[in-house]
């Protein structure tokens, strides 16, 4: 079984006058044939935080963690059998009509990323594929739209069965590791800070712009 885990960093806002509006939006996919070693990274990091800071179990969220926690988790991820593929979007160059259809834009970007994963044949799909995306919308209709759109695109073009799930990082621990990877890559583009990115760059097999 091949697993693809998907998360994003940045936002899809286009009012650049607002302070918190990001310049870039990225979608990160991590794929592996065995998710268990990555789950163990999360478990080990939680255990260390409990011992040192008496912190209760919860969710690791990279933006909220201390630098040492980020570094350790990313270094551990770099040692595992997994690969990362990224599409980054310079939002200033997004077509006007797509700016007004954010869900369509999100689906579009995700589909292009999945197409590249399949075309590069980085993962074996003969035993099936599970795509697990981090829950982005609480709206059930939008979640179903996302799942049906991607399933239709992949199955029609590649004749491959793909099972798509939308879960929280609490439900699917590996998504917490993808959050760290996505945050590290986002820092490189948004803030020209590649210090965290360099910890996992050996795992990144492709990193492409959309609307360059």
List where the protein language model places each region.
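Phosphate-ester processing/binding pockets and catalytic centers
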Residues: 1-212
């Amino acid at each position: 079984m091949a697993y693809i885990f998907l998360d994003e960093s940045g936002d899809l806002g286009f009012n650049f006058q607002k302070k918190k509006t990001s310049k870039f939006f990225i979608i990160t996919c991590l794929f592996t044939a065995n998710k268990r070693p990555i789950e163990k990274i999360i478990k080990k990091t939680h255990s260390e935080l409990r011992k040192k800071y008496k912190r209760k179990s919860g969710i690791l969220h990279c933006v909220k963690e201390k630098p040492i926690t980020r570094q350790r988790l990313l270094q551990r991820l770099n040692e595992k059998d997994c690969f990362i593929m990224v599409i980054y979007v310079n939002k200033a160059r997004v077509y006007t009509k797509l700016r007004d259809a954010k869900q369509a834009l999100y689906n579009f970007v995700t589909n292009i990323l999945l197409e590249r994963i399949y075309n590069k044949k980085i993962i074996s799909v003969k035993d099936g594929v599970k795509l697990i995306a981090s829950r982005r919308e609480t709206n059930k209709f939008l979640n179903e739209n996302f799942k049906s759109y991607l399933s239709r695109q992949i199955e029609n073009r590649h004749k491959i069965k793909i099972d798509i799930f939308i879960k929280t990082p609490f439900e699917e621990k590996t998504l917490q590791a993808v959050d760290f990877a996505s945050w590290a890559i986002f820092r490189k583009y948004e803030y020209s800070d590649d210090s965290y990115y360099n910890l996992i760059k050996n795992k990144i097999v492709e990193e492409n712009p959309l609307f360059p």
